Amino acid sequence: MVVVAPQGAGRAKLWGDAAVSKPFCCGLVVGKFCPLHRGHETVIERALSNCDEVLIISYTQPEFEHCDRATRERWLTQGFPNATTLVIDNAHLAQLCQRLGFADAPTLPHNDAPDDDHRRFVAWLCRFILGKTVDAVFTSETYGDGFAQVLTAQFQQIVPNAPPVKHVCIDPGRSAVPISGTRVRLSPHENRQFLSPAVYASFVERVCILGGESSGKTTLAQTLAQHYGSVWVPEYGRELWERKNGQLVLSDMLEIGRQQWQREEELACAANRFLFCDTSALTTLFYSQAMFGSVAPELRSLAQRHYAHVMLCAPDFDFVQDGTRRDPAFRDQQHAWYVQELASRSILYTLLTGTVAQRLQQAQSCLKRGKAQ
């Protein structure tokens, strides 16, 4: 998908009766953006302030963990809605070419390919995918001069009167924003000050804590969040149940799933390394089946969400009735359903047993190892 800026965005502004034009008509920013960091944002913001229109192109071959095509597109379109954004991988480029009627689609040059291969590829994307030429390219690298020369030559082959492309170099020594994508990928949490909250959220490991009623999952989520200096996501279903005095209807199940998802998205931006989720849409799916014998297709989709870690609290201590719960037999039924459902979905999980202190220790060991036991 090509995300096009809203009509009129970034155009010349009117002050009284006179139009105040920016120095360039169309600017270009190209990068892997793996991930998008403050240095990249500085370059893009400078381009937006100096150009009537800005094109942002992102590709990488190979891709990097947490920085897939869809994620990079989300970062860029949310952060810079007034730019035209093209984020591609080979599959996406092939789809675009087919849609535009090209018989063959080029493949992305490898990250280690010669500079001129990348420059000609970008020129082709500008002209044939975006239908644009540019008069400025913004970078923070010295190679930008050669980039501008190749773009000029490529554009003038097709549009002889295309203006020469000027290179605008911003903070080449990275003194203003001393960071690189490589450094962030190696240590995203130590370098989070160079990432916007929305980008950092993509590196947060989401920990899903499941368990039957009165199995200690809420206490565990709170305790883990406090231990790691992070945040936890409360169970929205319980809040809605209390608000409606226990009188839930089938449509409430989808609302619960959506709200739980939305809370995770919002709180991930405030998390530190881990986000502890007191339940997931999988629990809502269970209650939808148990209470109404039906599950909305969208809720089934929400229940497919991937978590970095899944922990299941065993029902191995006394059942505490707080007025909202059923009984120990239902708790056992729910636990058995989780075990079966997680197995059928091939989801690895850590079974937490014993006291709160013992469960906390087991959870910490799991997070330290980075995998279920």
Go through the PLM ranges and name each one.
Residues 1-205:
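Nucleotidyltransferase catalytic core that binds NTPs
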Residues 209:
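Hydrophobic anchor at the beta1->P-loop junction of P-loop NTPases
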Residues 212:
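P-loop (Walker A) phosphate-binding loop of NTP-binding proteins
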Residues 217:
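Conserved lysine of the Walker
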Residues 222, 226-265:
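Conserved substrate/cofactor phosphate-moiety recognition/catalytic segment
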Residues 247-291:
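Conserved nucleotide-sensing/catalytic segment adjacent to the nucleotide-binding pocket
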Residues 292-358, 362-364:
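A glycine- and Lys/Arg-enriched "phosphate-lid" helix/loop adjacent to the NTP-binding pocket
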